[in-house]
Each structure stands twice: as C-alpha cells, then as structure tokens.
Amino acid sequence: HVRIKSQAIYGEAYYDINDTTKLTLGFRYDDLTNATTTFNGGLLASNWIAAGGPLFENRMDVPGLTSYLVQNDSATNGMVAIQKYLQDDVMVYASYTTASKGAGVNGGTDPVPYDQEDTGVIDFGIKAKLLDGAMLLNMNVFQNDNSGMLLATIRNTEAFNINVDAEVTGFEGLMKVF
C-alpha cells in the first residue's frame, strides 16, 4: 500500500523591462511524504484492513506487516528567464531553472527507498517566424546538471528506481514550412 501526500505553493512574476524585453521570475516550494506499507497478503490482508489499515495506531503490530517505510522531502526551486524580441517575429531567450522530484520507495516484497532528484537547467534559444510567416523555426541549446537523477531499471519483473549523478547537454530544433 502506498500513500503519498504532496503540498506545494508556486508563483511567477513578469516584468517588462522595455517594449521588447521581458523578465520572468518563478518560485516553487514542495513538501512530500511518501509512505509504503508491505504485508504478506492472504488472510492477513483482511486482518490488516479490519484493524484500520494505514490508520492503525501501531502499524508494526498489524498481523502480516513486513515493512513500513516513510520518505519525507521538501524542496525550494526557482526560475529566472529573460526574453528579447529582436524583431516582431524573432525572439531570443535565456533561462535558468531548478527542479526537484521527491524521494520515494521502490515497490515489491522488499521495498528499498530512493533519494530525491535535484536538477539545474540552463537554456538558450531562438523562436522565429521567417519567410513572411511561411517558416516556423525554434532552436535551443541546454545543459542539465542532475544530482540524484532517477533512472528506472528492471529487476526480475519489477521496476526499480536508482539515483545517479548526470550532466546532459543538448540541442533541439524544430522547423516547419507551411
């Protein structure tokens, strides 16, 4: 049985520096609790439910309960971005964003916790309508610095999350001609 409680507050503010330049600031606070209860099922499952299940006062005394794990995390993240119109149809931008994904517990008969993932992303790009609006062009370069990046692996028949540190650098482009 998994019980997740998540609360967050977030907001963004925009400021027009001038007619062609806009600054965006963002903030997010997350509070996450992830509780996993494992029991061996069968007839004992009905005893666990009859005893109140996850509301049972002393969970470790419930017949058939094999583990009870709780992961608590909180994170504060932010974003700053600036966009500049070079022409009516051509805009360049730069941004820096942080993000988090809360810790959790891998499922299965022997649950193992995994840590929170934290990411910082820097992004530079251009968005343009060219050729009198006949072509849409979007391009950007980015770099993600991941601390505890979550990777899902398969162990036997179960998905199992692990944390690794990683740096991802890339280029994306989209061109549509109408």
Stretch-by-stretch model annotation:
Residues 2-144:
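Structural signature of Gram-negative outer-membrane beta-barrels, strongest in the C-terminal barrel
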Residues 130-132, 168, 177:
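A generic beta-sheet turn/junction motif
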Residues 1, 171-178:
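Short, intrinsically disordered, charge-balanced linker/junction segments flanking boundaries
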Residues 78, 162-170:
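C-terminal extracellular loops and terminal segments
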Residues 145-162:
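Surface-exposed, extracytoplasmic segments of Gram-negative outer-membrane nutrient-acquisition systems
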